[in-house]
Swiss-Prot record:
It is found in: Cytoplasm. It catalyses: Endonucleolytic cleavage to 5'-phosphomonoester. It comes from the Bacteria. One of its GO terms (cellular component) is ribonuclease H2 complex. The gene is rnhC. This is Ribonuclease HIII.
Amino acid sequence: MASITLTPSEKDIQAFLEHYQTSLAPSKNPYIRYFLKLPQATVSIYTSGKILLQGEGAEKYASFFGYQAVEQTSGQNLPLIGTDEVGNGSYFGGLAVVAAFVTPDQHDFLRKLGVGDSKTLTDQKIRQITPILKEKIQHQALLLSPSKYNEVIGDRYNAVSVKVALHNQAIYLLLQKGVQPEKIVIDAFTSAKNYDKYLAQEANRFSNPISLEEKAEGKYLSVAVSSVIARDLFLENLENLGRELGYQLPSGAGTASDKVASQILQAYGMQGLSFCAKLHFKNTEKAKKRLER
């Protein structure tokens, strides 16, 4: 199902509503000003000014605002910002988010370097090529440490909204550097509807439309670059945290994490665990139970 997010002017929004007023429908979402049920598409107009179009006819109605669809096969042939995050599924370590700006003339260089989805590259290869990428590619990297992560989760953010905030901030800061992308792609970690809902609470905003696409790291080199740099940043953070505590911290959230967590808990208490791990994971309770044996 096609999903398009736009930020048109209020004048264009009102013109759209007038044109399709017979399709207005009620919505229980407090963040939605207007909701329209159209043939082959739904349109949600949010209080933030964003518009979300979903359905097979999304592109048709988006054209009302001047939107022009880009064929998937030619998507690479545009100057793009792509974002990705690493660390979301790991108990230990922070959450790394990177936005990278890649132009078509950089594609050959990136392919020769071996850039692809970081999930298909060895950690050794990632550590090897990341310094080159950081030097050659305009990017913005953000790292939310475990201690800061634990501070904001359950207070202002949840596991999804904190990623929305980081992706948005990385893109915002990269745009501030003067790059001019024709498209912005986020490796989808939630629905466009959820993304826009959580985006409403963020202060830093930009007018460029974004596209959330599943497995985008395999479609766009800009997302692949972000994936690689983010993986390197996460691994570096994992090593540094482990070095400070005197433990080798495993990536992931399996039984190895439970074992190390129980050792850290015994040695340093919850304060030590909060320093290096995301406490809302189930591993925390499993580590406590290990100490009770």
